[in-house]
């Protein structure tokens, strides 16, 4: 039997408890677990413990039933047969109504486990508080279900993994570092480059040529390197980003510009 929640979702009765039924157990904790940039050995001891202890492992999925990069990273630590593997398909749209409904749906899926007293570990590559899907998930969970404890478990960022791959310090002494999502806005790119000694452009693949144009304009073309799938078995390093002009890169690509 289907029912409609106050948020407007149609849910199967056996999937979620009725709206007016109180939780019989203490509410579970929602953990945002950073699992590092790609190498499973870069997961922290605490993250490893939580992956083993939490009965529910939530992860971002491109489609229902699909896996994700974060899911692949933790496979060696998680016995999927002994866990509830909760794939969350996040909305990829600019329509505000669909976006809000999609996000609320993912929160309710997590809440269905939490209200039964199950701890949920949401795994995210890198760190949960740096440009992570978990940021919005946690914020909305606290808004809709303020009684849920939310805990962030830090992870190693791809930014730090890239520095290691390049054998290049990000900053020393009084040097300034900027970590910025790459954009087509040339003025924003220039401002970032002019005001920092080292700049890391995240998700650079879609705007690579634009960034290269701005670098050339500022005389910094030879100062940029690109790393894809940092620390994973598929990691690739280009120390001269200029050679990549016109190239289609992996989505998980970042650029490091060191003056």
What name fits each language-model region?
Residues 85-89, 154, 224-232:
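A generic structural motif
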Residues 1-40, 45-47, 52-149, 212, ...:
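Class I S-adenosyl-L-methionine
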Residues 103-112, 169-181, 243-254:
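A polyampholytic, Gly/Pro-enriched intrinsically disordered region
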Residues 98-106, 165-168, 192-195, 237-244:
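Short, surface-exposed amphipathic charged segments that create phosphate/polyanion-binding patches used
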Residues 129-195:
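Class I SAM-dependent methyltransferase SAM-binding "motif I" and its flanking Rossmann-like core
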């Amino acid at each position: 039997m289907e029912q409609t929640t106050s948020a407007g979702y149609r849910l199967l009765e056996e999937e979620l408890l009725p709206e007016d039924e109180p939780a019989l157990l203490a509410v579970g904790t929602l953990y945002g677990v950073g699992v590092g940039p790609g190498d499973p050995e870069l997961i922290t001891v605490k993250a490893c413990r939580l992956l083993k202890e939490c009965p529910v492992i939530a992860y971002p999925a491109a489609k229902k039933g699909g896996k994700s990069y974060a899911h692949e990273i933790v496979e060696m630590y998680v016995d999927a047969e002994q866990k509830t593997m909760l794939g969350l398909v996040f909305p990829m749209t600019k329509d505000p109504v669909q976006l809000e409904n999609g996000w609320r749906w993912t929160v309710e899926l997590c809440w269905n486990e939490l209200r039964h007293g199950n701890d949920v570990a949401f795994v995210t590559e890198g760190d949960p508080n740096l440009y992570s899907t978990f940021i919005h998930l946690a914020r909305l969970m606290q808004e809709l279900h303020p009684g849920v404890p939310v805990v962030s478990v830090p992870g190693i960022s791809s930014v730090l993994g890239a520095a290691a791959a390049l054998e290049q310090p990000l900053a020393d002494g009084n040097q300034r570092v900027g970590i910025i999502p790459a954009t087509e806005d040339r003025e924003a790119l220039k401002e970032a480059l002019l005001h920092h000694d080292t700049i890391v452009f995240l998700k650079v693949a879609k705007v690579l040529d634009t960034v290269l144009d701005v670098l050339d304009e500022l005389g910094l073309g030879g100062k940029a390197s690109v790393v894809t799938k940092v620390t994973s078995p598929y990691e690739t390093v280009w120390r001269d980003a200029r050679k990549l002009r016109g190239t289609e890169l992996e989505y998980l690509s970042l650029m490091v510009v060191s003056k």
